[in-house]
């Protein structure tokens, strides 16, 4: 694309030896589609927004983790108090003898799965390492770059230890109710979600859980689930031959007319218009 925005190394790294640094987004504003001359890890701490990665939309909130390659196109829209950090790095500058490909999905041709989640325990451990990494990446002493790379190695190992697929929180996990709730919602794309049954199973207060969810994500539980379903519908409309009524069912809407109303309200266009526009841009 002729007018594609490209983020350059020279605007983020202090010199050609620096391999890794941290870019804070407190908060992350709307950001047009772009690629990079470097790679990045994206950690979402709070709030919510729409992250479009290689034309696939993700409704993101606390605990979402992305591995972004240099050539990937992504953007941020519909942000609401979205707080995240980008840990940016240049693969060719890394010197430590670590199996980076085993730690980082998509690293120099490794199998790429971009979207993961971290529970509260993993987030807390990652935050501690990122704070140290940010301090070293801003340092000027002779060993700052080496220390930053050591911490980056510790970070990617920490992330690998604690990350899990968005709909697959390990059964042995000691994560919080909020983590379990977000995983349960990700498993409810096609079927109704019963919050009262979830709270009964977890022996928790429905009112308190609603308050905690809104405080951390900036959305109600129903808003989040609806927007996750709409993101899934957008992807299916663009990348599958399914009929709109079939997509409606796969995204938890038994009534395709109601699905169309909700989809139009959330995206500003009907499902048919979205599919037509997406096919034109391919």
From Swiss-Prot:
DNA-binding region listed in the record: 196-217, 244-267
Site location (Interaction with sigma-70): 246
InterPro entries: AraC-bd, Homeodomain-like_sf, HTH_AraC, HTH_AraC-typ_CS, RhaR_RhaS-like_N, RmlC-like_jellyroll, RmlC_Cupin_sf, Tscrpt_act_RhaR
Transmembrane annotation, as ranges: none
Protein's cellular compartments: Cytoplasm
Gene Ontology CC entries for this record: cytoplasm
GO molecular function terms attached to this record: DNA-binding transcription factor activity; sequence-specific DNA binding
Keyword Transcription regulation: yes
Domain HTH araC/xylS-type span(s) in chain numbering: 179-277
CDD domains xrefs: cupin_RhaR_RhaS-like_N
Pfam families linked to this entry: AraC_binding (PF02311), HTH_18 (PF12833)
Keywords of the record: Activator, Cytoplasm, DNA-binding, Repeat, Rhamnose metabolism, Transcription, Transcription regulation
Example of a GO biological process term: rhamnose metabolic process
Main function: Activates expression of the rhaSR operon in response to L-rhamnose.
Annotated HAMAP family: HTH_type_RhaR
Protein name: HTH-type transcriptional activator RhaR
Top-level taxonomy: Bacteria, Pseudomonadati, Pseudomonadota, Gammaproteobacteria, Enterobacterales
């Amino acid at each position: 694309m002729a007018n594609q925005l490209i983020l350059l190394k020279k605007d983020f790294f202090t010199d050609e030896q620096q391999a890794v640094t941290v870019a804070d987004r407190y908060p992350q504003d709307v950001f047009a589609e772009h690629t990079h001359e470097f790679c990045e890890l994206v950690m979402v701490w709070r709030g919510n927004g729409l992250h479009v990665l290689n034309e696939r939309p993700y409704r993101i909130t606390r605990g979402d983790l992305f591995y972004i390659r240099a050539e990937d196109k992504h953007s941020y829209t519909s942000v609401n108090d979205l707080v995240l950090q980008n840990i940016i790095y240049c693969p060719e500058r890394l010197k430590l003898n670590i199996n980076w490909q085993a730690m980082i999905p998509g690293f120099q041709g490794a199998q790429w799965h971009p979207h993961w989640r971290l529970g509260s325990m993993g987030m807390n451990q990652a935050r501690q390492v990122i704070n140290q990494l940010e301090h070293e990446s801003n340092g000027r002493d002779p060993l700052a770059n080496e220390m930053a790379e050591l911490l980056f190695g510790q970070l990617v190992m920490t992330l690998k230890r604690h990350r899990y697929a968005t709909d697959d929180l390990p059964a042995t996990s000691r994560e919080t109710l909020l983590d379990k709730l977000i995983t349960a919602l990700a498993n409810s794309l096609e079927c109704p979600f019963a919050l009262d049954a979830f709270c009964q199973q977890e022996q928790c207060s429905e009112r308190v859980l609603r308050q905690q969810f809104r405080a951390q994500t900036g959305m109600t539980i129903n808003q989040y689930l609806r927007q996750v379903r709409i993101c899934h519908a957008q992807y299916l409309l663009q990348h599958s031959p399914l009929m709109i009524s079939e997509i409606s069912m796969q995204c938890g809407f038994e009534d395709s007319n109601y699905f169309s109303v909700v989809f139009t309200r959330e995206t500003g266009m009907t499902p048919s218009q979205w599919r037509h526009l997406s096919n034109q841009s391919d």
